[in-house]
Curated annotation (Swiss-Prot):
InterPro entries: Ribosomal_uL5, Ribosomal_uL5_bac-type, Ribosomal_uL5_C, Ribosomal_uL5_CS, Ribosomal_uL5_dom_sf, Ribosomal_uL5_N. Keywords: Ribonucleoprotein, Ribosomal protein, RNA-binding, rRNA-binding, tRNA-binding. This is Large ribosomal subunit protein uL5. Belongs to the universal ribosomal protein uL5 family. This is one of the proteins that bind and probably mediate the attachment of the 5S RNA into the large ribosomal subunit, where it forms part of the central protuberance. In the 70S ribosome it contacts protein S13 of the 30S subunit (bridge B1b), connecting the 2 subunits; this bridge is implicated in subunit movement. Contacts the P site tRNA; the 5S rRNA and some of its associated proteins might help stabilize positioning of ribosome-bound tRNAs. NCBIfam families: PRK00010.1. Part of the 50S ribosomal subunit; part of the 5S rRNA/L5/L18/L25 subcomplex. Contacts the 5S rRNA and the P site tRNA. Forms a bridge to the 30S subunit in the 70S ribosome. GO terms for biological process: translation. PROSITE patterns: RIBOSOMAL_L5. GO terms for cellular component: ribonucleoprotein complex; ribosome. GO terms for molecular function: rRNA binding; structural constituent of ribosome; tRNA binding. The gene is rplE.
Length: 183
């Protein structure tokens, strides 16, 4: 269990909820959108044929998230990618609760400012149902990973799942939490 102090959760409860209630005219606090979970997905490419590389990426993702990843397997064979059904093709972690809030804080305040040539998150990456997706091209922006200990640069996809009904609600939720969006 994570017992770390969660500044972002406190900010959500004390600052973001009242702002969202005022902006969207919610009458009940349960109508306010909240973040349900964060899903981090990492495709491993040639790691499907190299068990050592798979284990290194598994340890990296575990260090980044604080939770052991699940190995995802191919659902069907694709000859062009040299993938057979059942081969390991990726790693996935679903974060909820305190780990989710810690990861959100780390993404917004530590990781995104370290991304090279970062000009803000794309505000058009919402899925129409209030969920936000973005990708990172390398894992070295996380403080837990150093370039000399990692064998290969590996990107990842991050999906923030919210209870928001519209993209506008989700956008304001993430913006009030401190996510830097492009203008």
């Amino acid at each position: 269990m994570v017992t770390q102090y969660i500044p972002l959760k406190e900010k959500y409860e004390k600052e973001v909820v009242p702002k969202l209630m005022k902006e969207f005219n919610y009458r009940n606090i349960n109508q306010v959108p909240r973040i349900e979970k964060i899903v981090i997905n990492m495709g491993i490419g040639e790691g499907s044929r190299n068990a050592d590389l798979l284990n290194k990426h598994l340890k990296e993702l575990a260090a980044i998230t604080g939770q052991k990843p699940v190995i995802t397997k191919a659902k069907k064979s694709i000859s062009n990618f040299k993938i057979r059904k059942g081969m390991n093709v990726g790693l996935k972690v679903t974060l909820r609760g305190l780990r989710m809030w810690n990861f959100l804080y780390k993404i917004a305040n530590i990781v995104l400012p370290k991304v090279r040539d970062f000009r803000g998150l794309n505000p058009n990456s919402f899925d129409g149902h209030g969920n936000y997706s973005f990708g990172l091209t390398e894992q070295f922006v996380f403080p837990e990973i150093t370039p000399d200990q990692s064998p290969k640069t590996q990107g990842m996809d991050i999906v923030i799942v919210t209870t928001a009904k519209t993209d506008a609600e989700a956008f304001k939720l993430l913006e009030f939490l401190g996510f830097p969006f492009k203008r």
